[in-house]
């Protein structure tokens, strides 16, 4: 072959390592292509075939750059070969290079297909997560917009109903308390009146006892006077008898004296003396009888008047006592009726208090249950918000990872689509491993998103980015 064969072949292999964290920088090494270069002399000349192997790495100096290609010479092999006119060329090295190139291209196709499959699966997963995220966001918005409002309306409505019932029960209790106070006032007034009536009864009984003592004293005085009257009557009768006896004796004496006068006419003054004595005795007896009768009549009249007065007072006291007894009986019946009414009202009040306490406890249980439901809904909302925040973080991480993969794919596509002449025209500069290690750097971006919630509602949301150069 008279024309020198000089071409640049590109041998590259895609070796990527995907980690679990989504924020891998773009500056990680992606491939290590090997660039063989063979030089063939012309016919009739002696030349050497030189092949150099370069290690190319992609580094990123920023967040979105495609990177730069760096090549370092690993070794040089020289194979002497002389071609003359009419001599057979040795294509063993070219065949080996072509075979290696075909193998590398086949491996690259397989790896590209696997990467495409993985990327398609990853995109499907991202779409699924986005759908889940949208569904969760819609559910969060629905819960945020409807459920708390409905629960709040139900809670407020039930609370208003409970307050209305409490007001009704409070009014009923106030009315019952007023009635009870009125009944207690009536009872106190009746008790005071009863005490007054009891005092009046005691005074009447004391007066009656005093009147009884007076009546007894009057009765005793009357009996004494009756006895004295009887004794006086007996004395009068006795005096009458004595007077009659004396009169009879005097008459007998007078008769004897008359006989003696008749017989003896010498005593004419005796009859006159007897007549004077009889007259004196009759006058004295009549005076005594009249005085005794007047005294007896006056005493009997006084005793009769006192007895009548005492009988009238006793009858009046008995009548008042009967009236007091009737009043006491009526007051006792009224007090018993008021006691029964008070007992029934107290029983109704206790029943109302028990029912009010049971209803209040039931309302408190309902309020506690509603508050527990509200707290549970708030916890559910907070949990959904946390899940939503986690999904947002995952989405952001996935977006960053997708952008990273997109930039990687764009860089690889731009690198693959470059013509071979571009790679042959590259000015590879040889660097040492120490210089490569000092020049290779990566940039790591960490995004921190802070969402503050209060009572299940988003209060504030802040995003912070931190850049680290590795």
Swiss-Prot record:
Please tell me, according to the UniProt entry, what happens when changing residue 401 to K. Answer: In MFM1; results in the formation of a filamentous network disrupted by multiple breaks and clumps or large aggregates
In alphabetical order, the GO MF annotations are: cytoskeletal protein binding; identical protein binding; structural constituent of cytoskeleton
Primary location: cytoplasm
- Any idea which UniProt keywords this protein has? ADP-ribosylation, Cardiomyopathy, Cell membrane, Coiled coil, Cytoplasm, Desmin-related myopathy, Disease variant, Intermediate filament, Limb-girdle muscular dystrophy, Membrane, Methylation, Muscle protein, Myofibrillar myopathy, Nucleus, Phosphoprotein, Ubl conjugation
Region (Coil 1B) residue spans: 152-252
> Which parts of the sequence carry Omega-N-methylarginine?
16, 37, 70
Pfam families to which the protein is assigned, alphabetical: Filament (PF00038), Filament_head (PF04732)
- Chain spans, region Linker 1: 142-151
Q: What does the record say mutating residue 120 to D does? A: In CMD1I; results in impaired filaments formation, does not localize at intercalated disks
Which parts of the sequence are annotated with region: Head?
2-108
Q: What is the effect of changing residue 241 to E?
A: Found in a patient with severe arrhythmogenic right ventricular cardiomyopathy; uncertain significance; the patient also carries a frameshift mutation in PKP2
| Region (Linker 12), start-end ranges | 253-268
* IF rod domain segment(s): 108-416
Identify the stretch(es) annotated as Coil 2A.
Answer: 269-287
Q: Where is this region: Interaction with NEB?
A: 268-415
Query: What protein name does the entry list?
Result: Desmin
What species was this sequence derived from? Homo sapiens (Human)
